[in-house]
Amino acid sequence: LVGSEMCIRDRNFLIRGSKDIEERFIGNAFMFNEKERAKILKNPTGKYNHKELTKPFYDKVKDKDDVTKMQYIDINFWLIGDILLKADKMSMAHSLEVRVPFLDKEVFNVARTLPTKYKVNKSNTKYAMRKAANQYLPDMVAEKKKLGFPVPIRIWLKDEKYYNMIKKAFTSEAANKYFNTDELVKYLDEHKEGKADNSRKIWTVYM
């Protein structure tokens, strides 16, 4: 099963890699393809083309390299509408003040002028920042692998407590207005039984 999931991911990676950056980037974050959306939604929104949404932004950097294009899309979509929004809401909910020093205006204005070769290369990420860090910090810190803040949702969803909690939400009257609840429960059951890793899809619907 694990091997088959890896094959699917590898195949999708190769398919995306064969497409133009304007077609594949941002599409990487899709949780459901068109067929899956048609199955779970009672009133599907029809064929959705993310290129229509991103085109005005890609047009502004059409003469730039692919890395710069992806960064521009990230800044205008993912950064503003996703990760910063979530961090702000979750930190405020727990009375925490969160700061993002790398988004300081002066730091950002310097970073945006860097040639792509100093941002990332074939063997290193955040190349310029790591080289700067090497001057002041131990190598084990400056060269440390990037880590996010993942939580074990995949494991939690197999726990009876959380499985039942989400199943209750998926079969509720509110969910039934918008979703084909049998399809949602199918995703949940497949995950709990270890037949597929549906954790991100389940979490997307639940949230």
Q: Each PLM stretch: what is its role?
A:
Residues D10-M207:
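Adenosyl-5′-phosphate
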Residues L1-I8:
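Short, small-residue-biased leader/transition segments that mark boundaries at the very start
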